[in-house]
From Swiss-Prot:
The gene is WBP11. It comes from Homo sapiens. The modification Omega-N-methylarginine is found at residue 192. This is WW domain-binding protein 11. Residues 1-11 have a biased composition (Polar residues). The keyword Mitochondrion does not apply. There is a cross-link at residues 557, 572 (Glycyl lysine isopeptide (Lys-Gly) (interchain with G-Cter in SUMO2)). Keywords: Acetylation, Coiled coil, Cytoplasm, Disease variant, Isopeptide bond, Methylation, mRNA processing, mRNA splicing, Nucleus, Phosphoprotein, rRNA processing, Ubl conjugation. Residues 28-37 have a biased composition (Basic residues).
């Protein structure tokens, strides 16, 4: 900090002599009082209590790091207060560091303790705030200990305590058989509960298969084993074929609990089959076999111990034929509309019905005979069913396309689900057999070609029987009928399927004429106004041919729309403005030139004044007069030169 001159201010401005004298006097006074001021500052610091300063800072910290209550003061205010208190405490430390080192050491200890407390408060505050933002599900839990705990496990068998059972699993549908075999041993070998203690309650969920097995033994009823799963048992463990379902075998045998376990699954499957007969026949096709023939087959197998049957196809085919009778074409169609796969048997039924449709045979007994023949083939040969099932899908494509059109028609609610499925259908369904499939919508009412056979071939009736009704109401038939009808089917698709029903009743009376030839009926009105609009250009083009008529027409239209009179205030001056000055000056001398000018004035005044926008007819007249004037002007110039 350099010395400043007393003759100028800080900015360098010259000072008055009086101000210069005052500044010099103050400088001397400050130099004299510097020691005194330092002593005053030290005395003020000594008057302040460092412990009180620490307590004030602790209060600020508690206020700031309080997780329960928001601080009363603003964050910025808290920082400023702490900063001032901290600076004061540091000045006191520096003062006592020079004057009294002992007090300095004590103050240093207070500062360290304060810092530790502040760190603890900050850590606790952060932990609480973080815990509020963390979700309970995101907290990782510790792994379960692998070693068994000290809890007494008396009669509850642990599945994890029998690792060998994993290797002896005979089927994926049942629990390990080894676990079942160890169950009685656990009951005898494990010590019982003390007399004063009660066993724990059953675990949540359905009873385990072991309990079902024990209950079956006590009550005395025997559950049946499905034949298909019995075949699996024979494949995996031949001992079961020899022993069968003998309950006298010791409890350690591997087949002791397996039949009951599988029986429970069988009952579940039977209940499931009752539901899936209507919805998903493909996935549970095998379970259809076991529902009716289960008791019969199991009773026979109980009587004969050796009942290894690797080819149990007749039973399956019998049940499948039963299923074929149960699954009607209506159900197959509903399954197809629901987006589910149709069981192969249902498709075969459709195949038979379609063959009869194509032959147009009104005899329903032919269908029964064909089904009986199919039954006999399936009974005689097990592989015939597999081959027929493999051949059914390719042949069942036309039925889905041919039987589909009747569906949209029957109920008013039918069309909504039908359009999304039908658009791809008609093009593929019409080529193979237009007579059987499309006729309900395409044939006139006088051709009941298929309406007789359809109700008889398809027992349910309503879906196939309704097609005779739709022809009077075209909306249901519009989606599948674009190729034959042409224009009419293209109009409905933009509208939603629910709109067509009101058309016949409400909109038909006024719209009957245009609906038949829709495009020809709609377009003729448009050409009628067009000739009136397009007739103007020919008239305009023809107008220049007749100057008088064109001028008259232009004047009439111009007066109606645009008035060009204000454009020419002085006709003579405006017309002769572009004429050379020589012509204007010497106009009285040259009578020949004046006459054409007057003529041009008279001729061009009318078109310029009244028909300025349409200058077509007036152009030739003005051009001719100007040419005459120009020729006269050139002659005059030649005479002058």
């Amino acid at each position: 900090m350099g010395r400043r001159s007393t003759s100028s201010t800080k900015s360098g401005k010259f000072m008055n002599p009086t101000d210069q004298a005052r500044k010099e006097a103050r400088k001397r006074e400050l130099k004299k009082n510097k020691k005194q001021r330092m002593m005053v500052r030290a005395a003020v610091l000594k008057m302040k209590d460092p412990k009180q300063i620490i307590r004030d800072m602790e209060k600020l910290d508690e206020m700031e790091f309080n997780p329960v209550q928001q601080p009363q003061l603003n964050e910025k205010v808290l920082k400023d207060k702490r900063k001032k208190l901290r600076e004061t405490f540091e000045r006191i430390l520096r003062l006592y560091e020079k004057e009294n080192p002992d007090i300095y050491k004590e103050l240093r200890k207070l500062e360290v303790e304060y810092e530790q407390k502040r760190a603890q408060l900050s850590q606790y505050f952060d932990a609480v705030k973080n815990a509020q933002h963390v979700e309970v599900e995101s907290i990782p839990l510790p792994d379960m200990p692998h070693a068994p705990s000290n809890i007494l496990i008396q009669d509850i068998p642990l599945p994890g305590a029998q690792p060998p059972s994993i290797l002896k699993k005979t089927s994926a549908y049942g629990p390990p058989t080894r676990a079942v075999s160890i169950l009685p041993l656990l009951g005898h070998g494990v010590p019982r509960l003390p007399p004063g203690r009660k066993p724990p309650g059953p675990p949540p969920g359905p009873p385990p298969p072991q309990v079902v097995q024990m209950y079956g033994r006590k009550v005395g009823f025997a559950l049946d084993l499905p034949p298909r799963r019995r075949d699996e048992d024979m494949l995996y463990s031949p001992e079961l074929a020899q022993r069968g379902h003998d309950d006298d075998v010791s409890s350690t045998s591997e087949d002791d609990g397996y039949p009951e376990d599988m029986d429970q699954d069988k009952h579940d499957d039977s209940t499931d089959d009752s539901d899936t007969d209507k919805s998903d026949g493909e996935s549970d096709g095998d379970e259809f076999v076991h529902r009716d023939n289960g008791e019969r087959d199991n009773n026979e197998e109980k009587k004969s111990g050796l009942s290894v049957r690797f080819a149990d196809m007749p039973g399956k085919s019998r049940k499948k034929k039963k299923n074929m009778k149960e699954l009607t074409p209506l159900q197959a169609m509903m399954l197809r509309m629901a987006g589910q796969e149709i069981p192969e048997e249902g498709r075969e039924v459709e195949e038979f019905s379609e063959d009869d449709d194509e032959d147009d045979s009104d005899d329903s007994e032919a269908e029964k005979q064909s089904q009986k023949q199919h039954k006999e083939e399936s009974h005689s040969d097990g592989t015939s069913t597999a081959s027929s099932q493999q051949q059914a899908p390719p042949q069942s494509v036309p039925p889905s396309q041919i039987q589909a059109p009747p569906m949209p028609g029957p109920p008013p609610l039918g069309p909504p689900p039908a359009p999304p499925l039908r658009p791809p259908g008609p093009p593929t369904g019409l080529p193979p057999g237009p007579p059987p499939g499309a006729p309900p919508f395409l044939r006139p009412p006088g051709m009941p070609g298929l309406r007789g056979p359809l109700p008889r071939l398809l027992p349910p009736g309503p879906p196939p029987g309704r097609p005779p009704g739709p022809p009077p109401g075209p909306p249901p038939g519009l989606p599948p009928g674009p190729p034959p009808r042409g224009p009419p089917p293209r109009l409905p698709p933009p509208a939603p399927p629910g709109i067509p029903p009101p058309r016949p009743g409400m909109m038909r009376p006024p719209l009957v004429p245009p609906l038949g030839p829709a495009p020809p009926g709609l377009f003729p009105p448009a050409p009628l106004p067009n000739p009136g609009v397009l007739s103007a250009p020919p008239n305009l083009i023809q107008r220049p041919k007749a100057d008088d008529t064109s001028a008259a027409t232009i004047e009439k239209k111009a007066t109606a729309t645009i008035s060009a009179k204000p454009q020419i205030t002085n006709p003579k001056a405006e017309i002769t403005r572009f004429v050379p000055t020589a012509l204007r000056v010497r106009r009285e001398n040259k009578g020949a030139t004046a006459a054409p000018q007057r003529k041009s004035e008279d001729d061009s005044a009318v078109p310029l004044a009244k028909a300025a926008p349409k200058s077509g007819p007036s152009v030739p007249v003005s051009v001719q007069t100007k040419d005459d004037v120009y020729e006269a002007f050139m002659k005059e110039m030649e005479g002058l030169l």
